[in-house]
């Protein structure tokens, strides 16, 4: 949502980073089917899109609100037998697959590499220290994802550096339809349980020593995460309460030197 995105950008700027920021805006109306067995809303619910329209210095917005860059309906149509039981409220919206495809597209749009930050994240330190070109990526690995039947490890997408030139050279991928959450019908397939960042991690492991990663076991102490900002888009009151509680990470003190804030806004 735009409020979370703006706060994320402001938190990055507050930590002294004046690097260019790219926001890939996938905002779109979301239809949540009526739940069964007490799961989900009683009636079909439509969450209206709320695009990020704020104009901020040093921030570029890639508008995909109408599928101009990635047509997700067309993408999902390639997998007519995709699993419909691995998602939220017993009906998958394939948010993970869309997320994965988006990051893979960013490899084309930002071929020199980038630091990936999720829009519902607030950073607590200068993230430019993650940019280390001797590594294929710098980030945090989640080994035991809750609810993952096969415990497939992954690189958390909340905050990580990806060295796109190195990764591309060695044939690593962020998206592989054989290893992507819910794109196959059979829930017993291990490949169906690869969440965002899992495919890339496996490729990096399989190409050692060509690709070496820098792991930050305590990287989660460098940021706080709202969790699920993309699919809780209708819960604006909850989001605002979370931002109010954590405003120290992005709000400028009243007596601060204005030069500290060169820009504002961000997220990928």
Where are the language model's segments positioned?
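N-proximal low-complexity "stem/linker" segments adjacent to membrane-targeting elements
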Residues: 1-10
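Short, acidic, metal-binding catalytic loop of nucleotide-sugar glycosyltransferases
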Residues: 10-19
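Catalytic core and acceptor-binding pocket of nucleotide-sugar-dependent glycosyltransferases
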Residues: 168-248
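Acidic ATP/Mg2+-coordinating residue in the GHKL
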Residues: 25-27
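Active-site-proximal specificity loops/subdomain of glycosyltransferases
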Residues: 29-110
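Short beta-strand-to-loop acidic/aromatic patch adjacent to the donor-nucleotide binding site
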Residues: 111-122
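A structural signal for isolated positions on well-ordered beta-strands in alpha/beta enzyme cores
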Residues: 20-22, 60
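Conserved catalytic core of nucleotide-sugar-dependent glycosyltransferases
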Residues: 92-94, 121-202
